[in-house]
Amino acid sequence: MDSRDRFNKFTERARKVLALAQEEAQRFQHNYIGTEHLLLGLVREGEGVAAKVLTNLGVQLSDVRRAVEFIIGRGDRIVEGEIGLTPRAKKVIELAVDEAKLLKHQYIGTEHILLGLVREGGGIAAGVLESMGVKLEQVRAETLKVLGTKE
């Protein structure tokens, strides 16, 4: 499956998360979209399953932004145009597609991106969540609970 096919299965909200992730990368003057920007996009989107899960776990946009700034800081120049995903963020997207398949969903939603982020587990986003006292297993369990799915 090439990337065009993969993104065709993304819900409107999941596509919005990717656009918001790019905006967040630009806000921080980063010339890449990393897992931290995906997390910011998921929180900022505000209406999808992932946003609901993160809200249920007490994750707030202002706290995530502060943690990202503390951990990696800001870039030194304004970034314009399209920004690419880091290898780790690409892996999260691949895992999101896989999570959708495992759950037998015909679409890729915000919940799958969040599950991919948790499953990847080693990026800055995972570190940000853990620094906020949110364990990755909690995120997975809460996501499945909100979806009404058992493992």
Q: What residue spans do the PLM features occupy?
A:
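Histone-fold recognition with a strong bias for associated Lys/Arg-rich disordered tails
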Residues: 1-151
